[in-house]
Amino acid sequence: PWENNKNISQKKRAFYQYYATMLEPWDGPAAILFSDGDVMGAVLDRNGLRPSRYYITKDGRMILSSEVGVLECDPENILVKERLRPGKMLLVDTVKGEVVDDEKLKELYASREPYGEWIDRNLVQLSGLKIPNVKVESYTGEQLTRLQKVFGYKYEDVNTMILAMARAGAEPSGAMGTDTPLAVLSSQHPPLFNYFKQRFAQVTNPPIDAIREKVVTSTSVYIGAHGNLLEDKPENCKVLKVHNPILTNTDLLKIKYMNVPGFKVATVSINYYKNTSLEKAIDRVFLEVDRAYKEGANIIILSDRDVDEYHVTIPSLLAVSAVSQYLIRTKKSTA
């Protein structure tokens, strides 16, 4: 992505950074064509997973398709034979009778507003936040073991997965079969996470991850109120940029106690008394989130700390999903 591209101009970098605060990344595979009747354009996903080739002929035609040969064309009539490259755009202006290439097109739009100034004044980096004068929570071996049991970690998970990742910084490789039943068919009580599988657009290649495909992936996350995509203004990029979604205790404290104009952080517990129904517990979380929103919070931390023998926690996957859908349903959030 643009973050790893050292060859783009500062204007384009600021342009991409500005819109990254409002747009979710997309990996494709997709070749998108668009037109308003006067101009026609095409853009390819940044991984280049969908082929897109085009001809420009001497008699003023452009032919673009995922494959060569969809239309018969005399080779002697071909002026340009090219392909749309990963993450690139192409624009045909039929009024002016010209083809606008990726570089010119993006420089044009990147120069419309002072995006660099807007980013400098509004975007907040997690790495730039001060560490609060608060003790960072640590755990004894006994406390850690108890927490692992609470959150469903097995001895095998810790030793074959977590320990290996901590040592190597990557998932361990394995090629053994598994006779573990699907979560929905299991006679045990698997964690809620086990009921869900990653969805991705598979063509002929495996899922893309940020370790093996660093050149085309980013792990940055933007936290805060999303701006209006249809209205360019400085306040749109008033968000907190987190470079990695896996947060340390220090990172969480920096967010919890951040003192930056335009940001207000609230913490809502997702723990509940063990004799309470899960449905009532989620409704109580909705009420607390709603109260925090009305008090001006634009960052909400859902906390499962302080679990004990009398309290259990709503699975974090369920809690985050439920709160997200509640905020969308009540028109307090757009995504």
Per-segment meaning from a language model:
Residues 1-31, 37-42, 54, 263-335:
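Glycine-rich phosphate/ribose-binding loops and adjacent secondary-structure elements
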Residues 232-276:
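Domain-start "cap" segments at the beginnings of catalytic or binding domains
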